[in-house]
UniProtKB/Swiss-Prot annotation:
SUPFAM superfamilies, per database record: C-type lectin-like
Main localization, broad class: cytoplasm
Annotated function: Promotes osteogenesis by stimulating the differentiation of mesenchymal progenitors into mature osteoblasts. Important for repair and maintenance of adult bone.
GO (cellular component) term, any one: cytoplasm
Protein name: C-type lectin domain family 11 member A
Keyword Manganese set for record: no
Example of a GO biological process term: positive regulation of cell population proliferation
Subcellular location: Cytoplasm; Secreted
Region of interest (Disordered), ranges: 22-111
Domain C-type lectin: 188-325
Gene name of this polypeptide: Clec11a
Length: 328
């Protein structure tokens, strides 16, 4: 069937071209219409033979004279031609087997411009809304900043007020401690001594005395030392307790200072009993008690014995009773 198709496609154009050449003005006047037609048929027959040989078809297929003489070949030719026409119709109608009943119109330049302008208008409206929201946010930020500044000012005022109240409270506590020390303790000249029965390290005891408006006891002379010894003996009898004084050599070993930085001018160190001299010890809980101070760099703070008023050096981190001194 494909061979017959190819044969028809090749023969028809050639026939048309040969027919046109045969009917040219020169040929018509040279031999007349009869000779031209006969010559044309011979050429067509020769061409068909060449095509049949080239395609491997039996001789006589596609020849009208042979078709008239052989009915079977004519029927085959018609069947082949009919099938070829049907295939051509199928091929022609295949691309348009499902046509779109509502084809979409192609956009025009005016439509494109209108669309772009619409989008620009939408963007401009959105940008305007953003500007409005930004303005609202800026206003809110300004309000919050002002509120925060007011809160900071109020907090600063409150902090100043609290600081002032704390200072007043500290002064009140110091005045209360001073009055309590002079009312409950020992008043001696322009000083008052008050014993505390709480166990504290030397530094903590100094801090507590300072918070109440005083400091650890700093006996300035022998008279104050003897008066303080009698006060402690009466308060803690019949026991012997070491009591922190405001004396230390933390700055330099052997250089004893009061808490106010003044250098100590006299000492009342404990001395052991001497059998050779027959002297009595200053504080004799045991005849073999060592002379003080004997702690070196390990014992830099001074405590007073409550029974005889002698001084002993101790580790500053020991927790002992302490006696405070207040100005009067």
């Amino acid at each position: 069937m494909q061979a017959a198709w190819l044969l028809g496609a090749l023969v028809v154009p050639q026939l048309l071209s040969f027919g046109h050449g045969a009917r040219g003005p020169g040929r018509e006047w040279e031999g007349g219409w009869g000779g031209a037609l006969e010559e044309e048929r011979e050429r067509e027959s020769q061409m068909l033979k060449n095509l049949q040989e080239a395609l491997g078809l039996p001789t006589g297929v596609g020849n009208e004279d042979n078709l008239a003489e052989n009915p079977e070949d004519k029927e085959v030719w018609e069947t082949t031609e009919t099938q070829g026409e049907e295939e051509e119709e199928e091929i022609t109608t295949a691309p348009s087997s499902s046509p779109n009943p509502f084809p979409s119109p192609s956009p025009t330049p005016e439509d494109t411009v209108t669309y772009i302008l619409g989008r620009l208008a939408s963007l401009d409206a959105g940008l305007h809304q953003l500007h409005v929201r930004l303005h609202v946010l800026d206003t809110r930020v300004v309000e919050l900043t002002q509120g925060l500044r007011q809160l900071r000012d109020a907090a600063s005022d409150t902090r100043d007020s609290v600081q002032a109240l704390k200072e007043v409270q500290d002064r009140a506590e110091q005045e209360h401690g001073r009055l309590e020390g002079c009312l409950k303790g020992l008043r001696l000249g322009h000083k008052c001594f008050l014993l505390s029965r709480d166990f504290e390290t030397q530094a903590a005891a100094q801090a507590r005395c300072k918070a109440r408006g005083g400091s650890l006891a700093q006996p300035a002379d022998r008279q104050q030392m003897d008066a303080l010894s009698r006060y402690l003996r009466a308060a803690l009898a019949p026991y012997n307790w070491p009591v922190w004084l405001g004396v230390h050599d933390r700055r330099s070993e052997g250089l004893y200072l009061f808490e106010n930085g003044q250098r100590v001018s006299f000492f009342a160190w404990h001395r052991a009993f001497s059998l050779e001299s027959g002297a009595q010890p200053s504080a004799a809980t045991h005849p073999l008690s060592p002379d003080q101070p004997n702690g070196g760099v390990l014992e830099n703070c001074v405590a007073q014995a409550s029974d005889d008023g002698s001084w002993w050096d101790h580790d500053c981190e020991r927790r002992l009773y302490f006696v405070c001194e207040f100005p009067f």
